[in-house]
């Protein structure tokens, strides 16, 4: 199943080029520090204008592995308590 963007144009730009530019800007605003090897992290996922600077700072600081797992909450009561995307 490929999930279509649910909030494109509201929480982040709908245009892929504008989105890429905004993400690069958020990552570029982060203070340059040595990369950390972390076993996990908690990152906010609100609209980029609200929490993008925090997410950018976290991701800029991490040494990202080749494979990782993303855990996220449901925003609605419907659906399974736990799901795995393919």
Sequence positions of predicted segments:
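Active-site histidine-anchored catalytic micro-motif
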Residues: 1-86
């Amino acid at each position: 199943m490929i999930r279509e963007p649910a909030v494109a144009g509201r929480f982040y730009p709908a245009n892929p080029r504008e989105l890429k530019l905004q993400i690069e800007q958020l990552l570029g605003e982060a203070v340059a520090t040595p990369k950390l090897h972390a076993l996990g992290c908690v990152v906010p996922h609100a609209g980029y204008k609200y929490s993008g600077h925090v997410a950018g700072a976290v991701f800029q600081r991490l040494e990202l592995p080749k494979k990782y797992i993303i855990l996220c909450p449901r925003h609605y009561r419907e659906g399974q308590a736990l799901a795995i995307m393919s």
